[in-house]
């Protein structure tokens, strides 16, 4: 088990390990716990009451956070024809077709999100699947990153839409803002994410769906919250 430094241990003393905090309390507390020399990301970590081995119980979706993520998301749009212009006008950072696919094959990866129109997904999947898939960047209709409404998709991502999906342990981890956010905005984003999670509860999931929910910062300790507070 790794040993934490003095800074982390001092922060840990501010957290009551036996307390389940309200969302508002946690939003204020994590700001105190963010003492790194950069603007730490605030994340929600949720353990779900699902069997991740069953495909019908996997949780995947998107949510538009009311106050965004506090960072510029570099969006790559892969399209052709008139959809290229639509993507450019919507604010995509990079737009292209076959030539940009080749650029990625050559090692270029300076983007945070990839969207595509359905008519290019054959080439995207066959040529880029092995590169983008393991990084969670391959466009997917279930993730809301494939569609002919590519302009709308780009605008939503730029405004703070995030994708979430459970890992093989049945947990979900998602960014919900920056430590520099006012606590009220952090609380709004946390609640929006939790509502989206609950809206994606699989029909086959039994018992408590949100088994435990924690809020943490990049370098700070985690704070357990009551997701319905």
Curated annotation (Swiss-Prot):
<protein>
    <recommendedName>
        <fullName>Large ribosomal subunit protein uL1</fullName>
    </recommendedName>
</protein>
<dbReference type="InterPro" id="IPR023674">
    <property type="entry name" value="Ribosomal_uL1-like"/>
</dbReference>
<dbReference type="GO" id="GO:0006417">
    <property type="term" value="P:regulation of translation"/>
</dbReference>
<dbReference type="GO" id="GO:0019843">
    <property type="term" value="F:rRNA binding"/>
</dbReference>
<keyword id="KW-0689">Ribosomal protein</keyword>
<dbReference type="InterPro" id="IPR002143">
    <property type="entry name" value="Ribosomal_uL1"/>
</dbReference>
<dbReference type="GO" id="GO:0006412">
    <property type="term" value="P:translation"/>
</dbReference>
<keyword id="KW-0694">RNA-binding</keyword>
<keyword id="KW-0810">Translation regulation</keyword>
<keyword id="KW-0820">tRNA-binding</keyword>
<comment type="subunit">
    <text>Part of the 50S ribosomal subunit.</text>
</comment>
<dbReference type="GO" id="GO:0015934">
    <property type="term" value="C:large ribosomal subunit"/>
</dbReference>
<comment type="function">
    <text>Protein L1 is also a translational repressor protein, it controls the translation of the L11 operon by binding to its mRNA.</text>
</comment>
<comment type="similarity">
    <text>Belongs to the universal ribosomal protein uL1 family.</text>
</comment>
<keyword id="KW-0678">Repressor</keyword>
<dbReference type="InterPro" id="IPR005878">
    <property type="entry name" value="Ribosom_uL1_bac-type"/>
</dbReference>
<dbReference type="InterPro" id="IPR016095">
    <property type="entry name" value="Ribosomal_uL1_3-a/b-sand"/>
</dbReference>
<comment type="function">
    <text>Directly binds to 23S rRNA. Forms what is known as the L1 stalk, which protrudes beyond the 70S ribosome surface. The stalk is preferentially stabilized in 70S versus 50S crystals. Interacts with the E site tRNA, blocking the exit path. This blockage implies that this section of the ribosome must be able to move to release the deacetylated tRNA.</text>
</comment>
<keyword id="KW-0687">Ribonucleoprotein</keyword>
<dbReference type="InterPro" id="IPR023673">
    <property type="entry name" value="Ribosomal_uL1_CS"/>
</dbReference>
<dbReference type="GO" id="GO:0003735">
    <property type="term" value="F:structural constituent of ribosome"/>
</dbReference>
<dbReference type="Pfam" id="PF00687">
    <property type="entry name" value="Ribosomal_L1"/>
</dbReference>
<dbReference type="GO" id="GO:0000049">
    <property type="term" value="F:tRNA binding"/>
</dbReference>
<dbReference type="InterPro" id="IPR028364">
    <property type="entry name" value="Ribosomal_uL1/biogenesis"/>
</dbReference>
<keyword id="KW-0699">rRNA-binding</keyword>
């Amino acid at each position: 088990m790794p040993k934490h430094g003095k800074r982390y241990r001092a922060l840990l003393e501010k957290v009551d390990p036996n307390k389940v905090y309200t969302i508002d309390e946690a939003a204020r507390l994590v700001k105190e716990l963010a003492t790194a020399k950069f603007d730490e990301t605030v994340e929600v970590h949720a353990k779900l009451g699902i069997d991740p081995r069953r495909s019908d119980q996997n949780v995947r979706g998107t949510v538009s956070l009311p106050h965004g993520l506090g960072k510029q998301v570099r969006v790559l749009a892969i399209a052709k024809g008139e959809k290229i212009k639509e993507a450019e006008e919507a604010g995509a950072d990079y737009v292209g077709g076959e030539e940009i696919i080749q650029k990625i094959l050559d090692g270029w990866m300076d983007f945070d999100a990839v969207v595509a129109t359905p008519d290019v997904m054959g080439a995207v999947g066959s040529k880029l699947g092995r590169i983008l898939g393991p990084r969670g960047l391959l466009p997917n209709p279930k993730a809301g990153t494939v569609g002919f409404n590519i302009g709308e998709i780009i605008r939503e991502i730029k405004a703070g839409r995030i994708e979430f999906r459970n890992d093989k342990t049945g947990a979900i981890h998602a960014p919900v803002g920056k430590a520099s956010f006012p606590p009220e905005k952090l609380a709004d984003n946390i609640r929006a994410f939790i509502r989206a999670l609950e809206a994606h509860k699989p029909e086959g999931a039994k018992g408590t769906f949100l088994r435990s929910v924690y809020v943490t910062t990049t370098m700070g300790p985690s704070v357990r919250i009551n997701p319905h507070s």
